[in-house]
């Protein structure tokens, strides 16, 4: 698998993703500066966590206009795998690859903790190493992670099976306890928890490693 990790001014989880994909899983990984447009030869694009462009205006509002993200939209629309983690999830909603928005946490505080979430379906590339209903313990670190959407959008997400991960204790007040969603096709995933921070036992959990490892099988098949 050939992985591309987009790097914005203010990204701070890009190297964590690189360590998982290249260091732990041995996959070719290229860091893509936000001004680049060339995504040729890549199987997976990761839009990592951090504070792109300082979170000015609002999280992801400026990053959506970057050349790399415009190329990512085309990549996703052609069926390429795209993963947005934390700030990356916010950016994916800003560019319209995923519905809804991420807004201030219900308690107005930055939440940095490990939280349990449930796998809602295991028939997506992202969740193929998990079982439906399995509980994962993943870290969160965000101030604007509360997923919000209008009732019609929420109903569509549920009807289409687009909710992939759901909080058990909803630390931020997200609608329908949503922690991660896909697009209808399933090739784009946005999630607020950080799987790349739960990939080694020394970090306290390996529950996130399966998300990345599971992507290797469909590409190699």
UniProtKB/Swiss-Prot annotation:
What compartments host this protein? Answer: Cytoplasm
Note one Pfam family from the annotation: GATase_5
What GO terms describe the biological role, i.e. biological process, of this protein? Answer: 'de novo' IMP biosynthetic process
The catalytic residues are: 86, 194, 196
Top-rank lineage group of the source organism? Bacteria
User: Which pathway is it part of?
Assistant: Purine metabolism; IMP biosynthesis via de novo pathway; 5-amino-1-(5-phospho-D-ribosyl)imidazole from N(2)-formyl-N(1)-(5-phospho-D-ribosyl)glycinamide: step 1/2
Protein name (database record):
Phosphoribosylformylglycinamidine synthase subunit PurQ
Gene (name only): purQ
């Amino acid at each position: 698998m050939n992985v591309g990790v987009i790097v914005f001014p203010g990204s701070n989880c890009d190297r964590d993703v690189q360590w998982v994909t290249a260091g732990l899983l041995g996959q070719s990984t290229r860091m893509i500066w936000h001004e680049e447009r060339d995504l040729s030869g890549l199987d997976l694009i990761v839009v990592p966590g951090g504070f792109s462009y300082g979170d000015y205006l609002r999280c992801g509002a400026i990053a959506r206009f970057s050349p790399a993200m415009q190329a990512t939209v085309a990549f996703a629309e052609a069926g390429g795998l795209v993963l947005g983690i934390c700030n990356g999830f916010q950016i994916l909603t800003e560019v319209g690859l995923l519905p809804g928005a991420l807004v201030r946490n219900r308690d107005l505080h930055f939440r940095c903790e490990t939280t349990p979430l449930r796998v809602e379906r295991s028939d997506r590339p992202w969740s193929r190493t998990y079982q439906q209903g399995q509980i994962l313990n993943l870290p969160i670190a965000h101030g604007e992670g509360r997923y919000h959407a209008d009732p019609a959008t929420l109903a569509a997400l549920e009807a289409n099976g687009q909710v992939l991960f759901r909080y058990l204790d909803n630390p931020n007040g997200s609608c329908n306890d949503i922690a991660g969603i896909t697009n209808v096709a399933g090739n784009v995933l946005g999630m607020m928890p950080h799987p790349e921070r739960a990939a080694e036992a020394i970090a306290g959990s390996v529950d996130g490693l399966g998300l990345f490892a599971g992507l290797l099988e469909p590409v190699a098949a």
